[in-house]
Swiss-Prot record:
Component of the NuA4 histone acetyltransferase complex, of the INO80 chromatin remodeling complex, and of the SWR1 chromatin remodeling complex. GO terms for biological process: chromatin remodeling; DNA repair; DNA repair-dependent chromatin remodeling; regulation of transcription by RNA polymerase II; transcription initiation-coupled chromatin remodeling. It holds the Pfam family Actin. It is found in: Nucleus. It comes from the Eukaryota. Residues 289-317 are annotated as: Disordered. It comes from Schizosaccharomyces pombe (strain 972 / ATCC 24843) (Fission yeast). CDD domains: ASKHA_NBD_Arp4_ACTL6-like. The keyword DNA repair applies. Belongs to the actin family. ARP4 subfamily. GO terms for cellular component: H4/H2A histone acetyltransferase complex; Ino80 complex; NuA4 histone acetyltransferase complex; nucleus; Swr1 complex. This is Actin-related protein 4. GO terms for molecular function: chromatin binding. Residues 302-317 have a biased composition (Polar residues).
């Protein structure tokens, strides 16, 4: 590979940070990604695909909404490649042939996905060099930490990882598929229990003011969209509710707690007051199955299905595979798996990131819960108040990492890729640890 691609001054590297909900793309060394795209596409029966908010948010008859990334892993590579190419060529206005690309990956990314990522970089995007960086390590670097315990709460995954001297420790890694989208599911069930149907914005032609608790007075457009598009838009309403109404109590929530009610207006103009639900729904992140205030019965542990749906133990949903743990328990499991000698360093460098961690009260509650678990320890939580730093942590870390002068020796060149045609996984495991 030529020195131009190693140097970093002549040609800027590009950083791609794919997530289940958002994909961030930008230039190495910058402090914010140039392009943040939904990790979804609008797909038509003739094979056409649309990307970007301005296209997939607009209703189109027959357009299916597809997400190529599930629980942090790429599942549909055709869609993923088109998404990355759209971001690079249409948004960044760059030619991937001219830029080395650092791409982030979760620590538990399957070996076959790692190989496929490498092949995609060289065969589909045809970049001159690439590197696969752990998202957990990158997020720690974004906070200036080489050793840390990372609490990452995203859309589909909650993970706690121990990072020591820049490497994620296998034995301390904890992850489960219960996070922001699961909170949406619980909100959806809460509204169904109230016999309330969410009408997303695209269906509302006009609306008139109504009193709180009264049915909407609106004119709806005829629906000619697919179920996947409709549900995609409904999820956006749930996300808005979380941003406006959801609160996480600084102590375990009790039904006896006095709650200030908050009004939420739905897209069709209907207005609803939310009281205890503001705390009850996100409380599941810390105490899964915390429904005592709803049904006057002891809470049942939440189970996780193979389809990553959420149910109660007595639900009709079958094929449950694992019990959901609260975030403090995930954290405790992570620390207990690590060597005693490094635990103090981990506890003194707890980093919080991920979009779901931005819910009001999250960091304080985590601080209180961990202080109870480790009363004699020097506990320090680093939770940036900047939305970009918290949401884009792994991209920012990748930007920092790839801009270091010492990083040039880590790039995998096209020549190396071609030389390891029979065993590319070995190349990845040797270089991208």
């Amino acid at each position: 590979m030529t020195s131009a691609f190693y140097g970093g001054d002549e040609v800027s590297a590009i950083v791609i940070d794919p997530g289940s909900k958002w994909t961030r793309i930008g230039f190495s060394g910058e402090d914010i990604p140039k392009c943040v795209l939904p990790s979804y596409c609008g797909e038509f029966s003739d094979g056409r695909r649309l990307f970007g908010e301005e296209y997939i948010y607009k209703s189109n008859p027959g357009m299916e909404i597809k997400n190529a990334i599930r629980n942090g892993w790429v599942e549909n590579w055709d869609v993923t490649v088109d998404l990355w190419r759209y971001g690079l060529e249409q948004q960044l206005k760059t030619n991937p042939l001219e830029h080395p690309i650092l791409i982030t990956e979760p620590f538990d990314n399957p070996p076959e996905n790692r190989v496929k990522t490498l092949e995609t970089m060289f065969e589909s995007l045809r970049c001159p060099a690439t590197y696969l960086a752990k998202q957990e390590t990158c997020a720690a670097f974004a906070s200036g930490k080489g050793t840390a315990c990372l609490v990452d709460i995203g859309a589909e995954r909650s993970s706690v990882s121990a990072i020591y001297d820049g490497f994620v420790l296998q034995k301390g890694y904890q992850v489960q598929h219960f996070s922001g989208n699961a909170i949406n599911d619980i909100l959806a069930q809460t509204l169904r229990d109230k016999n309330f149907e969410v009408m997303p914005k695209y269906l509302v032609k006009s609306k008139n003011p109504v009193e709180i608790g009264q049915p909407a007075n609106c004119e709806l457009r005829p629906r000619d969209t697919t179920d996947s598009y409709h549900q995609f838009q409904v999820q956006r309403v749930y996300d808005e509710w979380k941003e406006e109404c959801a609160l996480i109590s600084d102590v375990p929530f009790s039904s006896e707690t006095t709650i200030a009610e908050s009004e939420f207006e739905f897209p069709d103009g209907s207005r609803m007051m939310f009281g205890a639900e503001r705390y009850q729904i996100p409380e599941h992140l810390f105490v899964p199955g915390s429904d005592e205030e709803m049904n006057e019965e002891p809470s049942k542990p939440i189970e996780q299905t193979e389809n990553n749906e959420v149910s109660q133990q007595d639900s009709s949903v079958t094929n449950t595979s694992s019990r959901i743990l609260g975030i403090p328990q995930l954290f405790q499991n992570c620390i207990s798996e690590c060597d005693v000698d490094i635990r103090a360093s981990l506890l003194n460098n707890v980093i919080v990131c991920g979009g779901t961690s931005l819910m009001q009260g999250f960091s304080l509650r985590l601080q209180n819960e961990l202080s109870k678990l480790y009363p004699g320890s020097r506990l320090k939580i680093h939770a940036s108040g900047h939305v970009v730093e918290r949401s884009y942590a792994s991209w920012l870390g990748g930007s920092i990492l790839s801009s270091l002068g010492t990083f040039h020796q880590l790039w995998i060149s096209r020549q190396e890729y071609e030389e390891h045609g029979s065993d590319r996984l070995a190349l990845i495991e040797k270089r991208c640890k």
